[in-house]
């Protein structure tokens, strides 16, 4: 679904801190901190993960999974356009 690295990269692209992401996703700051401290793919409550992915989408980010076609291959994240 989403890796800790993708989550950190997402925040960096948006220029927001963990607290702002937590607010946007309707999650607690400790939840975001635990997610970012995860090894590789974030595991946890499905509802929390769905809220996180929906918030990143609403903020203008596109998650790239392992199966996406890209020159570099692998997972990543990119801006859809100008962030809101």
Give residue ranges: language-model regions.
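A detector for short, charged/polar N-terminal pre-domain segments
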Residues: 1-2
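Residue-level recognition of specific faces of alpha-helices
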Residues: 6, 31-34, 55, 76
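Short basic helix-loop element that most often maps to the first helix and adjoining turn
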Residues: 7-20, 81-82
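Helix-turn-helix/homeodomain-like alpha-helical modules used for DNA recognition
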Residues: 61-84
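DNA major-groove recognition helix of helix-turn-helix/homeodomain DNA-binding modules
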Residues: 46-63
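Residue-level "edge-of-site" marker
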Residues: 24, 45, 69
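Recognition helix of helix-turn-helix/homeodomain-like DNA-binding domains
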Residues: 27-44
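Residues in the recognition helix of alpha-helical DNA-binding motifs
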Residues: 10, 24, 35
């Amino acid at each position: 679904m989403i890796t800790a690295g993708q989550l950190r990269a997402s925040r960096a692209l948006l220029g927001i801190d963990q607290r702002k992401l937590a607010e946007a996703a309707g999650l607690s700051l400790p939840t975001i901190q635990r997610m970012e401290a995860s090894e590789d793919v974030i595991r946890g409550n499905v509802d929390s993960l769905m809220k996180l992915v929906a918030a990143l989408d609403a903020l203008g980010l596109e998650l790239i999974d392992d199966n996406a076609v890209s020159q570099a291959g692998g997972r990543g994240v990119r801006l859809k356009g100008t962030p809101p």
